[in-house]
Every structure is written in C-alpha cells, then in structure tokens.
Curated annotation (Swiss-Prot):
Catalyzed reactions: IMP + NAD(+) + H2O = XMP + NADH + H(+)
A GO CC term attached to the entry: cytoplasm
Residue numbers bearing the Phosphoserine modification: 160
Protein name: Inosine-5'-monophosphate dehydrogenase 1
One GO molecular-function entry: nucleotide binding
Organism of this sequence: Mus musculus
Functional summary from the UniProt entry: Catalyzes the conversion of inosine 5'-phosphate (IMP) to xanthosine 5'-phosphate (XMP), the first committed and rate-limiting step in the de novo synthesis of guanine nucleotides, and therefore plays an important role in the regulation of cell growth. Could also have a single-stranded nucleic acid-binding activity and could play a role in RNA and/or DNA metabolism. It may also have a role in the development of malignancy and the growth progression of some tumors.
Gene for this chain: Impdh1
Family that this chain belongs to: Belongs to the IMPDH/GMPR family.
Amino acid sequence: MADYLISGGTGYVPEDGLTAQQLFANADGLTYNDFLILPGFIDFIADEVDLTSALTRKITLKTPLISSPMDTVTEADMAIAMALMGGIGFIHHNCTPEFQANEVRKVKKFEQGFITDPVVLSPSHTVGDVLEAKIQHGFSGIPITATGTMGSKLVGIVTSRDIDFLAEKDHTTLLSEVMTPRVELVVAPAGVTLKEANEILQRSKKGKLPIVNDQDELVAIIARTDLKKNRDYPLASKDSHKQLLCGAAVGTREDDKYRLDLLTQAGADVIVLDSSQGNSVYQIAMVHYIKQKYPHLQVIGGNVVTAAQAKNLIDAGVDGLRVGMGCGSICITQEVMACGRPQGTAVYKVAEYARRFGVPVIADGGIQTVGHVVKALALGASTVMMGSLLAATTEAPGEYFFSDGVRLKKYRGMGSLDAMEKSSSSQKRYFSEGDKVKIAQGVSGSIQDKGSIQKFVPYLIAGIQHGCQDIGAQSLSVLRSMMYSGELKFEKRTMSAQIEGGVHGLHSYEKRLY
C-alpha cells in the first residue's frame, strides 16, 4: 500500500482542467461538443438555482430561454407560451408588417392587469361583431359602452354565455338584446389597486371586472383568466403594465422603418435587427435611427461572432448582441459562404468583450440539448435562442403532417429558398434581395412532433438548474463569475470521449427525456 501514500497531508490538490481563457487560447474553433465542464461542490438543491438573467441592458428574464424569429418557430402562440414561462419570443418578419404587428398585439393583450385598451362595442353592434372579435383576439368577454369606445358610459357586457346557443341566423341580432345589462354587473371604482380589484373579482365569481369612474364611464377592465395565469405561471415575463413581454424582428432597409413604427405602436418591448452578418453600414444606420426616434426601445444587434464585429454595434448603441453565424441545424452559411465561427468560440469571445460595456449576449444557434444550453451560459451568454429545439411543438406555426406514420412539422432556415420565396424579408437578411441568382444559406426540412412546450420548457429549466448544481453555481451570475475568475474548469473532449459520453454498447434503447 506504500505506493498509494503521498506526503504532505490531505491539503494537496493538483491543478486540474483548463480555465475558459486557456481553453480558447489557441486558434482552434470549438463548439459545444468539443468540451465538458468539470464538476464542483454541491451545497444547495437544484430548485434553489436562480436562472434570472439579462436579455438587454434594461430587460431581465427569469428564464434564459428565447424563441428564434423564424417563420416556422415564433408567432403569437409561441411568444405567449415563452413569456408565460419566464422567457421571451421574437415574432418573425417573414410576413407583412401588419401581420407581424397584429401578432405582437395578441401577445400584449393576452395577459394583463388593468386592461386600459380592451375591445369595446356599442349596443348597436351585432352578435356577428362579437364573433369576429373572438376570432381576431381570442376572447369574447366584451364591455358594451354607449358609443362603443373607452371613456364612454358603461351599459353592459357580452360574454360567451350570452351568445353560446344562438343560431347562425341570430348573428345580426343587436347586442342591446343579448348583453348582460349594467344593473347586473359587478364593477370597481377608478383608483382601486390591482390587489383590491383582484379580490373583488374573486368574490364576484364573474369573468370580467369593469373599472368605472364617478360618471360610470369605462376606464379599464380586469379578466378572471389573468388571475389564473398569475397563479399558474409565477415566472411570467411582464412589463410595468403587467403585460407579457414580446420581441419582434426587423430588417435593416429603408422600408423596415414602416414595419418598426407598426411594431412599436403594437407594444413591442424589444427589437432584434435580423441579419446573418450584423457588422454592416445598414445595421449601424438602423441602430442610430431607432435610438433617435424611439430612445427607450431596447435594440438587439447581430448576428456577430467576433469582438471586432461586436465593437461597431456596441459603439452604435445596441442594448444586446446576438451571437452565431452558420451554426444552426438548418444553416449552411459556413458551407456556402466560407464565413462563420464554431459557436463555443464565438460565444466566449464576444461575451468576454461585450461584458466590459454591460451588453448581454444571446447564444443563437447550435443548441441541440439542455447540456448545450448550460455550456453556452457557462461561456458567458446571458440567454440562449432556440430554433430547432422549439420547432414542431404545438405552439410553433404550421400544420402537422404525416410521413411514413410519423407526425411532423416543417422547419426551415430563413436563408432557405423556401423562406426567401415567401417574402423579401428573408432575402434582405442575407443581403440578396437584389440578386438575380439567389444563394441559399439554409435548408428546409421537417421535425418530429415534440408536443407542447408547456412540458418541454420546464424540462429545459430543470436541466439547467441541475447542470448548475453539478457545477456548484447557485445562479447564472455566479456561473459567469466562476468562469471569468478561472474557478470554473473545462476539459477538451476527443472523438472517443464524445462517443463514451453518449449512449453506447446497447443493442437497442429508448431515450425519454421527460
């Protein structure tokens, strides 16, 4: 046993692993599969890990997860679901400006405290108008005022219970004949606090609580469904008015300024400038324009993969940076353009530079597993943007179809010819709108049905928390501090090590993640 003895006592611990600086010191481009994080010391439970992180200089999320502005990933349904679970969704711009603004409006109206601009109708409107509003906005509890506008005298309310059993021939019936009249309504006075209004609504057992002033004029409304959402989604991302946070993508051309105006009017909280290569005169000019016209609007620039690219956008005034070029599962930019960078290296290099200016970084692309999310955050990213991970979920745009008995949804890169043919916005993203020959930088494909993100995102959240627990970081800010101080250690993986780290040696197996 003598050969096992080491003199000097138990205080001796040999140096082990590499710091992030050492890991990326040479010119090798590393991606998430090329390294592992060495475990630390656990003295807390996984549920205690705080995942709060910055999206931009002024917007903080309770969950570091973002859905990508792709036309097969994020429209209103996805953005609503992401915001409810503490993240945020960015509505794609491969559509008309009006359609995109309406999607943002759906998100902002989905869950609120005091709804100060609800849909309002007059007694002379018809049942058909209510049904049309339900199709457009997703609800049918509509206050009725004398003139059909806010600030007018409240005369009643129409809910689904008032019109559920009406036949199609009754769609021309006036609302004055079917509405619940004012005398039967429970209301709250203007000036009531949100807490007091919620208590009144709970006691009344009504679906809606109108807020009226001394002249009985409608000034706001509160919905019971919002109370239930507040209970079920404690991490929900909300603005100062208790509305869900929502982002939107725009291009960098002159006609995108009209789109920007509509998005700000719809209530977008943050804009991402959508470009495959963000270090351009077009994007810098757009940042200057937005900051001059809408100084309080948060702007995310990108995409970038080097500190030099990041510098120009930070100097222009961006509030966040989107990192990634050619690393997405449906992206062929590196193959076609010979430009890009392995995502691990890109995230570390840009985040290390941007943190000096207080600019958060979004790791965009190359995320295939929850382990990749943890690695991106450990390299300095504040949040992670996902495309393929969220594609083919219930909330993603598009219809399911079957192929060989498998339920699928379409998923395509915004640089694919399919996406470019749908709208010129995709062409502008890749600077090709004026080209006679379109150069595809993405592909179209399909992904197997994943079900609802109501189950998938909680799995991601729990996975991040357990990853941080193994590392010994009780919050994402601690995780980044450990990385920059050198306390967090990494190790490169050979191809054999990568094979060993996956499932191997089995004849067959079933891989259930949640």
